């Protein structure tokens, strides 16, 4: 049965290999793709912050922001502009965490077109060529 809840996914890589990934159904029904991407971005931001703290404990220099690749420009605009009220008035406050970590320059957002979204290997059925390309991008190689 389709409950109309969106599915979000992320993959974090280090040195060309996946070190953290998630595929999760969102807890609420999003009324727009923008809201769904924004909610997914908040979950991704929480994991990014945890990974930054972990890598810092291991001695990694974390002075530069961690880049999140986002394929929804409206979700990016909501993150950067707290006055974007019409689209945000029904978004739960807990999802606005992403604004804080972007504003304090711990994370940065970069627009990446859907065709280049590596995490889509978790959330979508892809054409074989795209599947192989994205699996290679996260360090998974086909065995001969």
Label the model's feature ranges:
Residues 1-16:
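Acidic, metal-ligating active-site segments
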Residues 6, 18, 24-144:
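RNase H-like nuclease module associated with reverse transcription
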């Amino acid at each position: 049965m389709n409950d109309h809840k969106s599915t979000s996914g992320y993959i974090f890589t280090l040195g060309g290999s996946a070190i953290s990934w998630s595929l999760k159904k969102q807890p609420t029904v999003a009324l727009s793709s923008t809201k769904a991407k924004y909610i997914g971005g908040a979950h991704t931001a929480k994991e990014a912050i945890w990974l930054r703290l972990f890598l810092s404990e291991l001695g990694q220099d974390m002075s530069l922001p961690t880049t999140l690749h986002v394929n929804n420009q409206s979700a990016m605009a909501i993150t950067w502009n707290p006055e974007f009220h019409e689209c945000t008035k029904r978004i739960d406050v807990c999802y606005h965490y992403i604004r804080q970590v972007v504003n304090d320059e711990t994370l940065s957002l970069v627009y990446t077109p859907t065709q280049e979204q590596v995490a889509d290997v978790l959330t979508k059925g892809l054409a074989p060529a795209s599947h192989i390309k994205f699996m290679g991008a996260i360090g998974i190689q086909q065995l001969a």
